[in-house]
Each structure stands twice: as C-alpha cells, then as structure tokens.
From Swiss-Prot:
This is 3-isopropylmalate dehydratase large subunit. It catalyses: (2R,3S)-3-isopropylmalate = (2S)-2-isopropylmalate. It is an enzyme of class 4 (lyase). Heterodimer of LeuC and LeuD. SUPFAM superfamilies: Aconitase iron-sulfur domain (SSF53732). One of its GO terms (molecular function) is 4 iron, 4 sulfur cluster binding. The gene is leuC. Catalyzes the isomerization between 2-isopropylmalate and 3-isopropylmalate, via the formation of 2-isopropylmaleate. Its EC number is 4.2.1.33. [4Fe-4S] cluster binds at residues 347, 407, 410.
Amino acid sequence: MKKTLYEKLFDAHVVHEAEGETPLIYINRHLVHEVTSPQAFDGLRAMGREVRQPTKTVATMDHNVPTDSRDLGGSGEMGRIQMVELAKNTEQFGVTLYDINHINQGIVHVMGPEQGLTLPGMTIVCGDSHTATHGAFGALAFGIGTSEVEHVLATQTVKQARAKKMKIEVRGKVREGITAKDIVLAIIGKTTMAGGTGHVVEFCGEAIRDLSMEGRMTVCNMAIELGAKSGLIAPDETTFAYLKDRPSAPKGKDWDDAVAYWKTLHTDEGAEFDTVVTLEASEIEPQVTWGTNPGHVIGINETIPNPADMADPIERQSAEKALAYMGLPHSIKLTDVAIDKVFIGSCTNSRIEDLRAAAAVAKGRKVADGVQALVVPGSGLVREQAEKEGLDKIFIEAGFEWRQPGCSMCLAMNNDRLEPGERCASTSNRNFEGRQGRGGRTHLVSPAMAAAAAVHGKFVDIRNVELH
C-alpha cells in the first residue's frame, strides 16, 4: 500500500486501535513550558502518579519571561507564580528544566530543534499550538491541551484521531528577497485560515527544498494558521546536516542507523492526498498582512482589497470588521502606512538566520523617529551566537532594543505589548485582535521586512533596500 509521510509516521506510533475508538499513539518527545503545565502536574500529584518517562520530557520557561531582565517577577505576579511552579514541578518529577538563567533557555520551539531533541520520525507534543514547527524535520508534531499534557506525562501516550491528508506544493524557485515567511503567508493567503482544517499538511516542491532548516521551521510553524493540525516536510540531507552533532542527536553507529531510517520517511510515489494545493514560487512577492488573521495578506505592491468586491457575505463582513479594527481604508497600498513598533522574534522568526537578515537591513541605518523596535532572540544560544557575530552591536547602534530570550511581544502575556491603536510590523505568526495587546494592530512580515519598516517608519519593498 502506498503511504504518505503522515500515514507512515502515524501508523508507526499506534499503540492501540479498535473499531469505533480513537487510536492511542505513543509520544517520543514531550516539550513543556510554564503556562499549560501547572494543572497537569497538579493532576499527577493528586492521583499519586509519576511522570512515566521523565527523560522524554524537557521543559523551559518562555511565555511569561521578561526580556528586559532575568527577574522572575519582571512580567508580573501571575508569570512569576507559573515559572516558580514549573521549577518546583520539574524538580519533584525529575524532568529536565532550562530555567530563566540557563543558556539553553528559550522559546520551546527554538530550544527543541537546536538541542537535537527534535528528530525525524518522532511524535512530538507540547501544550502549545505552534508545536507544528517541529514537523520541519519530518516529525509528527502537534499541540495538545492541558488535560492531554497530564495524560502524556502519566502514560507517554495520547488519543489522536487520524487526520485528512493535504499536499501543498510550491513549484519552482522564489525570486530574490523572498523568504520562508513570504512563502507561508502566500500559502495562507491562498488557502485562507480555514483551508487546512482537519488536515495534516505536507509541504513540498523545489521552493520548499531550497529552504534551510530554519526556513522550513518558519513554514511548518504557521501550518496551524491555515487551520491544519500539523505541517510536515520530508527529511533530506539538509535535515541531517543540521542535526549532526547536536547534543541530543544520535552519535556514532546510532547516527548511521538513524539516517538510514530517516531516508525512508517520504511520501511514496502514487500515494493519495485528500487535498492538493499548488503555488508558483516565482509569483510570490514580499507579504504583509492587512487584517486580523494571517489569511488577510497581500503582496507589498498590491492594494488592500475592497470588501464590496467579495462575493462571500461572511468573507465580506470579516474584511469590513478587520479594516475597522486595523484603522485602514480599503484600496490603498500598505507602503502608505506608518508604523509605531517593530517586533523581530517569536517561534516563527527568532533564529540566527532571521537575525542575520534583519541585521543586514539595520546595519548603517537608524530606527525612524517615533518607532520602538525590539529584537528578541529565540534562545540563549541564538543570543550568544548573534553576539559572537556582532549582530547585537549592529542593532543597538541602529536604535533597536536588544533583548533576552522569550516569547515577548508575540502575545500579551508579559511586559512587551502594544498600547491601544499602536501599529506593529511583527515577525510573529498571529495578527488576531488584541494578540499583541488590547487594541494593538499587528502586521505580519518577514524579519528583513520588519527591519526595513523600522528604519523607514513604514512598510517598504525589501527588494528596493540595499543590504549590508
């Protein structure tokens, strides 16, 4: 029987499956953070249970951590309590924790891959919707709720229904200046934010293969934003080169055996998908969102659509509401729109390649008057590498704020947030109402586009900006 990559991964992890029941699957790696885990550990404690396989669970602090200090209380009392509880729970149950002062601390979806905790063929879960990031390695990775976090801690398994299969092929090569963020935003613009509902998506095509692992993580990170359960990219030599010699990656003969297995993790020729979507890479422009979901997106040189031109009444009403919230008229270009803040970071775009791309724009320039610009590395190791390369100095000299690792302004759960009415060019993954702060207006862009907006005070076409 011909199988897709998703089917191979799912079938390899089924522990129990009976007619009329949701399959029970084994979980290879469980990533934990401070927000969705406290009640799960409390549940174990109440029932007198242990963590079944502590070595397969790794925790870090990310959502609530302040990025302007390493003070546990720096983001408020609730954040402090959650981080203190995580430290207490991981110590009691024997789980590895990268706390706020550890060099490996960082956003969970940055920390996992850079430590080699994310490997092809694995099932990976976390109490966070952007767990799909790890699918870039050919792992079946998806977010779970707190009750499921407890179930995985107790049993190393979770109930999971089979999803429909979707293939998204990006044909050909992208043009100069087009990034992974532009690719995935263009995909969501085509599918809409609900186009992948009920599916696991496999991304493929020459443009996807050409991406680095960091670019592939950006693409899979946002699979959830088109409604999918998870995103996948088949592992290849790019994957293996990234993983080799990572701390938790196999070594010696185990590495050779692992690679031999990983090479089988691809969709069989002739395997069938329920849904197929294709894009031409050469047609993708630098992308900017204009509304309140990632599907509200256009190329930088396009005009904001007129809701009156939308045939679907629900789509039309959604667009009207989005434009009212964003304080924008239809039929203008986003190059006419000034911004107040810039956020370069998040589990989508806070890795070293992202910071290099932003620094190439910032070098020798200054942040525009009246604009606050934050650069927040995704982990302690990313920050350390950036400082070795002198990127921090480039940002600081240009007027950007160089911060400590954390989720930061991606979500309003710490001190980095927008004030009502403020407009932000952000490299994060969600532009929902209030996502970055009550009344805040978020535009999703690539790191280079965000840096260009910071120095020009408005959105510009990155292809017209000289890079240093």
